[in-house]
Amino acid sequence: MLFRSILNRQNEARANWISGVSHDIRTPLSMIMGYAGRIAESKAASKSIREQAEIVRKQSVKIKELVQDLNLVSQLEYEMQPLHKEMVRLSKLLRSYVADLLNTGISDSYNIGIKITPDAENAVLECDARLISRAVNNLVQNSMKHNPQGCEVCLSLTASQNHLILAVTDNGMGLPAEKLQELEEKPHYMESTDERLDLRHGLGLLIVQQVAIAHNGTFKLTNVFPKGCEATLIFPYIG
């Protein structure tokens, strides 16, 4: 009991430290983004200066997203992220996500589809809808990012007596066999330099894993024949 108490305090201290650093970075970063944005749109600045300012602005946005992701991973891992659970019809959530994605005007190189089996159509899961959507978005964006030549991405939802299975499948280049083995051996580890697994700064996969765990679910990646990758979130469910 004493060891667990000490470990919990250490985990809480780590999470609070990351949260504090994230908060401290937010204000100066917002100022950098604001100034860079104004310069990028200034008619008084030369074309070269405007282009450089736009690069600074875009990279600042990436840093902001990285900080937010790092904070979210920490909060989820140490069970400090409040879960706003409600009864959510996942078929409706997925359709809404796909509609929003298509309305953003994605490239014609990507074909986004959705497949929901009759037994899952009215299935309701007690979950944090925002986090589930975030996990799905990370996986869809990863399929698109790592298949620049284009691919088909299918979101599917099926139900069994005990589980709801949410899958994101693409027909892209898939995962090297050695990387799949690494994931099985080290499910919470990912090299940020890995080109295929770098889901948004190397934290996206961890976010998906932690979202699954927070909902008493599991997450796995597999290759599909003849090519492509399938990411599966499995949640306990009583039909």
PLM regions with names:
Residues 78-83, 124-127:
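Conserved micro-motifs of the catalytic ATP-binding
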Residues 170:
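Acidic ATP/Mg2+-coordinating residue in the GHKL
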Residues 175-191:
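Short conserved segment of the HATPase_c
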Residues 143-144:
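Short helix-loop "hinge" at the ATP-lid/N-box region of the Bergerat-fold HATPase_c
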